[in-house]
C-alpha cells in the first residue's frame, strides 16, 4: 500500500477507535458487519461487537461511521 493510503486510513481508523464510534463495515462480498474498531494494523481490523472479529482489509469495501467524525491528516514534507 502506498504511503498516501496510510496517511488517510490510519488517522481515520484511529479516530474511530479512540472515540469508540460504532461503525458498519461492508465487505466486498456484500456482507455488513457492525461494531467498534478495537485495533488495526497494515492488514487487519479488529471489530468488536459481542465477540471480536479479525477482518482482513483486502476484504473491506467501505467503512461507515454511525456519526460524523473529524480527524487530522498529516501531510508529509516532500
UniProtKB/Swiss-Prot annotation:
Domain of life according to the entry: Bacteria
Entry-linked CDD domains: Hfq (cd01716)
Protein's UniProt keywords contain Ribosomal protein: no
SUPFAM superfamilies on file: Sm-like ribonucleoproteins
InterPro entries: Hfq, LSM_dom_sf, Sm
Domain Sm, residue spans: 10-69
Pfam families per the UniProt record, alphabetical: Hfq
Single GO molecular function: RNA binding
Main function: RNA chaperone that binds small regulatory RNA (sRNAs) and mRNAs to facilitate mRNA translational regulation in response to envelope stress, environmental stress and changes in metabolite concentrations. Also binds with high specificity to tRNAs.
Subunit structure: Homohexamer.
PANTHER family membership: RNA-BINDING PROTEIN HFQ
Annotated family: Belongs to the Hfq family.
Protein name stated in the entry: RNA-binding protein Hfq
Organism lineage: Bacteria, Pseudomonadati, Pseudomonadota, Betaproteobacteria, Burkholderiales
Amino acid at each position: 500500500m502506498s504511503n498516501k493510503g496510510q496517511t488517510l486510513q490510519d488517522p481515520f481508523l484511529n479516530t474511530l477507535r479512540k472515540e469508540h464510534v460504532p461503525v458498519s463495515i461492508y465487505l466486498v462480498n456484500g456482507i455488513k458487519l457492525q461494531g467498534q474498531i478495537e485495533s488495526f494494523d497494515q492488514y487487519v481490523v479488529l471489530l468488536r461487537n459481542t465477540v471480536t472479529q479479525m477482518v482482513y482489509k483486502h476484504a473491506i469495501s467501505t467503512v461507515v461511521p454511525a456519526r460524523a467524525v473529524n480527524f487530522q491528516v498529516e501531510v508529509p514534507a516532500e
